[in-house]
């Protein structure tokens, strides 16, 4: 898998898909560290769901393989793409994580993101910063967190 940002536009996405025969092209939508007030500054849209909706349509027209989106936007991507796009979801946080100093804004627990339809979860800091990373991985796999 290779990620490219959807805001690069349809032409760029199509070209990436064209030159990448065996590698899946995944489009990054709105970063999970951005809040609605940030979106107003960058995109002149004050709602992440509206922007992800537009980006999903661009991803579909470009015929890329998947989309990276916040777990808060999984439902929108599924509805628009009719399961044609794989959904990769960062912003995964564990129930008891201390996330007060974390930069991720639109987050969800692993079990919830899977129930909504995420195909892949991106889980970094909750595992990397854990005292026992393997314990956390096993708990996630057993769906206990």
Predicted regions: what is each one?
Residues 100-106:
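Short glycine/threonine-rich catalytic loop with a Thr-x-Gly-x-Asp
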Residues 1-75, 79-88, 93-99:
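Conserved anion-binding
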Residues 13-19, 114-116, 126-145:
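C-terminal helical cap(s) of enzyme catalytic domains, especially alpha/beta-barrels
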């Amino acid at each position: 898998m290779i990620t490219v940002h959807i805001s690069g536009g349809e032409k760029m996405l199509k070209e990436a898909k064209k030159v990448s025969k065996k590698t899946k092209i995944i489009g990054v939508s709105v970063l999970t560290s951005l809040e609605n007030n940030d979106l107003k500054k960058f995109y002149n849209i004050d709602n992440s769901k509206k922007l992800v909706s537009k980006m999903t349509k661009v991803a579909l027209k470009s015929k890329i393989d998947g989309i990276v989106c916040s777990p808060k936007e999984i439902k929108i991507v599924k509805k628009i793409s009719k399961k044609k796009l794989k959904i990769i979801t960062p912003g995964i946080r564990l129930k008891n994580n201390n996330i007060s100093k974390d930069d991720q804004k639109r987050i969800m627990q692993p079990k919830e993101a899977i129930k909504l339809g995420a195909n892949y979860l991106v889980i970094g800091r909750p595992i990397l910063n854990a005292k026992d990373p393997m314990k956390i991985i096993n708990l996630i796999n057993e769906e206990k967190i």
